[in-house]
C-alpha cells in the first residue's frame, strides 16, 4: 500500500470516562479488526490495571481497514491516548504521529478541564479536529448545550459534530465517514531516504525491544541496517509489522504508515522516544524535531521490604523504564530503610500506577516514602542547588533562600460546589487568577504550590465536589517561599525516611499529625518512647508512647517490703540501662502506614 491519500492517522482525545476506549472498541469491531468472540471491553487497554481503573495509561496503536461509501478502501491508523493529566506525555507522542484528532465529549457532562489540555496540544500539532458527542442515548444528554460549550470554550465549530453512543454502537459509521472525509492524509513523502519517528518502545521477553514508529519518508524493510540518530546505534531490522490490534508481520512499512519493528535491541538506553531512525547506508541529513521531554515533578523513595529483593527491584525498574520514558530513578540509601531508589514521576496517579505495576507484574513488596517536589536552594556562598530529597537539605544556616514550584490549575466545577472548591484552594495557599461561568459550570484558574497538590488535593477536590469537579494543571514558575525541613525523631534519633519539606505555616500541624500517627503505629516497649517533630534544633511537637510495665512483684505473696523494693530498684536500673543503649525498632508496617499518601 503506497498511495498515501488512502491513509488516515488519527488519535482520540477526551477526558477520563468520556468513552474513548469504548469508541475505539466499536471502531475495531466495525472494521473487523477482531472477530466478535475475540472482542472484550477496552480492547486497547492491555494492562489489567487499565481495565480495573477504567483509565488508559499507555497509548496504543491499531490499523483498521475501512471500505468507505465512496467505494475506496482506506487504512486508518488509530492512536488511543490516555486522558489523565499525568499521562499528557503519552498524549503528546501520539499526537505527533498523527494529522487529525477525534475530540470525544460526554454529552451528559460537557467539556472538562483535561479535555481542554489535550485539545490545545492537538491544535499545537496543527491537527484537524472532528468533535464527537458521546452517550447521546442517555436521558441526561444535552447535545445542543455541549456543542455551544465546545464553541465557547475551545473555539471549534461543533455544529456538525458527530452524535454517537459508543456503548450501543449508534453513529459509528458516521464517525468512520468523518475520519475519511474531514481528516487529512499524511503529507506527501519528500524523499526516498528513510526517516522515521520513534513514537514508543516496550520490552518483549522473546523479541527484546519492540519499537513503534511513524514513517515520515522512505520505507522501512526487513533486513536493512538502521541507525538511531540520537545515540548513533546501528541495528539490523528483523521483523516489521503493524497491529490490528493483533500483531501482523508485513516485511515493509511505507511513508505515512504507523507500525512496529524489532531488531534484537537489548539496551533500554538506545530507544530514546522522539528519536529519528534512518538508513545506515543512506542517512537523512536532519533529524526530526522529536518531543519536548516531560520532566518528573513528584519524587519519592521506593525500598524493598526485604533487602534481598534489591536486585529484583533494580531489574524491574529497568524494564518499566523502557515502557515508560517519563519515569526516572537513581539509587539511594536510607539509614532507616536500607538501599532503594529515588524515583521521579509526572504526578501522583503516575506514582500509584508504577507502584501497582511493580507489585503486580514483578511481585514486589515495597515501601514508598512521602512524595516531594523539586526545590531550588540558593546558598549564602552564591551556589544554587536543586533538591527533591529532604535528606539532602544540609545546614539551614548556609541557606540564603528557597524556592518552590507553583502550578497553574484549571478547575471546572458545577456552581453548587464552587464554594467548597474555592475554600479548598485557599486552604492550599492558592491565588485566584480567573473566574468565569459557562452555562451552569464555573471555570476557575488558580495558582497553587505543587507541594500542597502532591498530598491529598485531588482526593479532597473530588470529595468536596461529589466527583463532579475536573482538574488540569501545568508547571508555572518557581517563587521564593518560607520552607522548612520537618524532621521526625524517635528517642532522639532522626528517622530520615520520614523527613519532609513543608511551608513554615503548615509545619506544626503536619508535625503533630505525624507524631500522633506514629504513636498509634509503633508498638509499646519496655521503656518510654519519645516521638518528636523538629525544625532544625527546635522541637515543635511531641508524643510519648508509655512503657510496658512488667510486674516484677507478681511472685511476692506478702512478705518483707524491702524484698519488693529491691526488685523494683533492680527493674529501674535495667530500664535506665535500656534507655541508654537500647535501639527502638520501628516495624515496617509502621513506616508503610505513616507514609501513606493522603492520610494527612
UniProtKB/Swiss-Prot annotation:
The UniProt entry's GO CC annotations, sorted and at most eight, read: plasma membrane
Q: Which PROSITE patterns match?
A: G_TR_1, G_TR_2
For the keyword DNA repair, the answer is: no
tr-type G domain boundaries: 5-187
Enumerate the GO terms in the molecular function aspect.
GTP binding; GTPase activity; guanosine tetraphosphate binding; ribosome binding; translation elongation factor activity
The EC designation for this entry is 3.6.5.n1
The superkingdom listed in its UniProt entry is: Bacteria
> Which residues of the sequence carry a binding annotation for GTP?
17-22, 134-137
| Catalytic activity field | GTP + H2O = GDP + phosphate + H(+)
Listed Gene3D superfamilies:
3.30.70.240, Elongation factor 4, C-terminal domain, Elongation Factor G (Translational Gtpase), domain 3, P-loop containing nucleotide triphosphate hydrolases, Translation factors
Quote the InterPro entries the UniProt record gives: EF-4, EFG_III/V, EFG_V-like, EFTu-like_2, G_TR_CS, LepA_C_sf, LepA_CTD, LepA_IV
The UniProt entry, under Pfam families, shows: EFG_C, GTP_EFTU, GTP_EFTU_D2, LepA_C
Q: Where is the protein situated, by its record's location annotation?
A: Cell inner membrane
Could you tell me the keywords of this UniProt record?
A: Cell inner membrane, Cell membrane, GTP-binding, Hydrolase, Membrane, Nucleotide-binding, Protein biosynthesis
Report whether Nucleotide-binding shows up as a keyword of the record: yes
What does it do? Required for accurate and efficient protein synthesis under certain stress conditions. May act as a fidelity factor of the translation reaction, by catalyzing a one-codon backward translocation of tRNAs on improperly translocated ribosomes. Back-translocation proceeds from a post-translocation (POST) complex to a pre-translocation (PRE) complex, thus giving elongation factor G a second chance to translocate the tRNAs correctly. Binds to ribosomes in a GTP-dependent manner.
> Family assignment?
Belongs to the TRAFAC class translation factor GTPase superfamily. Classic translation factor GTPase family. LepA subfamily.
Which HAMAP family does the record match to this protein? LepA
Q: What is this protein called?
A: Elongation factor 4
